[in-house]
Amino acid sequence: MEKVQAQAAELEERVVAINRVTKVVKGGRRFSFAALVVVGNKAGDVGFGSGKAGEVPEAIGKASRSAKKSAKSVALKEGRTIPHEVIGKFGAAKVIMKPAAPGTGVIAGGAVRAVLESVGVKDILTKCVGTRNPHNAVRATIDGLKQLKQQL
C-alpha cells in the first residue's frame, strides 16, 4: 500500500460519523463536533481522517483535508474485489474480508461499507467482529486493505 498524490477533485468524500463532544469547564459545558470522513476515487485509492470544530461543516472540512493527506493505494483483483481473504485489526475491532463472485455486491455494514465503496470494491463479503465503533472499524478495514498482496 503506497501513498497517493491524488488530485483533490478526483477524490470523493463520504461522511461516516458525526459526533457531538463535550468539554466540561468551570463555567459549564462547551460543545463541539467531531467528524470521521473517508475519501476515495473508486479506483483503488482510499484515505480517512477525523476533524473537530465548533460547527459541523468546519469539522467535516478538517476531516476531509486529513483524509486526503492519508490517501493510499490498494491492490484490487480485476478492479472489482480483493485478491485474497484478509483480517484487519485495530483495537477491539476485527474486520474479516473475503473475495466474492461477480454480482455479489458489497456485503458490509456502515463504516466498513463506506471504506470499501470509496476504494472501488464491487464484490466482497465482510464481517465486523468485536467493537463496531466507526473509528475502529474504519481503521481495521484500512489495516486489512494494507495487507493485500497483488496475485501474479
From Swiss-Prot:
Stretches assigned to the S5 DRBM domain: 11-74
GO cellular component, one term: small ribosomal subunit
Swiss-Prot/TrEMBL keywords: Ribonucleoprotein, Ribosomal protein, RNA-binding, rRNA-binding
Keyword flag Ribonucleoprotein: yes
Keyword hit for Ribonucleoprotein: yes
GO molecular function, one term: rRNA binding
Alphabetical list of InterPro entries matching this protein: Ribosomal_Su5_D2-typ_SF, Ribosomal_uS5, Ribosomal_uS5_bac-type, Ribosomal_uS5_C, Ribosomal_uS5_N, Ribosomal_uS5_N_CS, Ribsml_uS5_D2-typ_fold_subgr
GO biological process: translation
Coiled-coil zones: none
Membership in a protein family: Belongs to the universal ribosomal protein uS5 family.
HAMAP family reported for this sequence: Ribosomal_uS5_B (MF_01307_B)
Functional note: With S4 and S12 plays an important role in translational accuracy.
Subunit and partners: Part of the 30S ribosomal subunit. Contacts proteins S4 and S8.
Comment field on protein domains: The N-terminal domain interacts with the head of the 30S subunit; the C-terminal domain interacts with the body and contacts protein S4. The interaction surface between S4 and S5 is involved in control of translational fidelity.
Name of this chain's protein: Small ribosomal subunit protein uS5
Higher taxonomy: Bacteria, Pseudomonadati, Bdellovibrionota, Bdellovibrionia, Bdellovibrionales
